[in-house]
């Protein structure tokens, strides 16, 4: 049971750091990103959910916390495919 607790702490910690990096280091989250997300989503309910979700930075950080290690794993696999 303690192993599960360690895993969840690591999962959420890596997700938090990835979200902070996405917003403050990469500076991807700006008006252009919001417009792109608005264009990429379909009309109707999906567009409303996307605009609601990406309305502020805390929602984006929470999203990255929940997906945890997935962005890190995707970046590592992309590096291996390139090299």
Curated annotation (Swiss-Prot):
Membrane-spanning parts: 5-25, 60-80
Membrane topology qualifier: Multi-pass membrane protein
Subcellular locations according to the entry: Cell membrane
Keywords, alphabetical: Cell membrane, Membrane, Transmembrane, Transmembrane helix
GO cellular component: plasma membrane
Main location: membrane
Designated name of the protein: SPbeta prophage-derived uncharacterized protein YopE
Organism: Bacillus subtilis (strain 168)
Lineage summary: Bacteria, Bacillati, Bacillota, Bacilli, Bacillales
């Amino acid at each position: 049971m303690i192993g599960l607790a360690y895993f969840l702490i690591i999962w959420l910690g890596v997700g938090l750091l990835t979200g902070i990096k996405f917003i403050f280091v990469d500076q991807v989250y700006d008006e252009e990103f919001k417009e792109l997300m608005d264009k990429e989503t379909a009309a109707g309910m999906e567009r409303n959910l996307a605009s609601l979700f990406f309305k502020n930075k805390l929602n984006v950080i929470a999203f990255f916390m929940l997906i945890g290690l997935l962005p890190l794993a995707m970046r590592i696999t992309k590096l291996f495919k390139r090299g």
